[in-house]
């Protein structure tokens, strides 16, 4: 699989207070394509960020029900991947920011 396909697989990193705390344990969270499997997520992270992945956990996140101006709707369903890296590897999302 070429590297541009991997960029379609990984939607975006999840940067919240909770994911910042687990990043100290070498775990990082990403929203991924809803058809993504553990093995393809592992290959994509290794190819894009040039790191060694130890383990991948996948979660299906059901969309919440929201009401806006009296109209009830639902947010989209998403798939989340928690990626554990080997000890000597890490990902720096804010590398070029000064």
From Swiss-Prot:
The entry's keywords: Ribonucleoprotein, Ribosomal protein, RNA-binding, rRNA-binding
The record's disulfide annotation reads none
- Asked if the record carries the keyword Ribosomal protein, the reply is yes
The reply on keyword Transmembrane is no
User: Oligomeric state and partners?
Assistant: Part of the 50S ribosomal subunit. Contacts protein L29, and trigger factor when it is bound to the ribosome.
Q: What does this protein do?
A: One of the early assembly proteins it binds 23S rRNA. One of the proteins that surrounds the polypeptide exit tunnel on the outside of the ribosome. Forms the main docking site for trigger factor binding to the ribosome.
Q: What is this protein called?
A: Large ribosomal subunit protein uL23
From which organism does this entry originate?
Answer: Rickettsia akari (strain Hartford)
């Amino acid at each position: 699989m070429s590297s541009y396909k991997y960029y379609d697989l990984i939607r975006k990193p999840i940067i919240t207070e909770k994911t910042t705390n687990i990043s100290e344990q070498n775990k990082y969270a990403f929203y991924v394509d809803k058809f993504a499997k553990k093995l393809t997520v592992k290959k994509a992270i290794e190819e894009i960020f040039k790191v060694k992945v130890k383990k991948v956990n996948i979660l299906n996140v059901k969309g919440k029900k929201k009401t806006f101006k009296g109209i009830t709707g639902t947010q989209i369903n998403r798939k989340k991947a928690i990626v554990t890296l080997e000890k000597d590897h890490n990902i720096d999302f804010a590398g070029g920011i000064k």
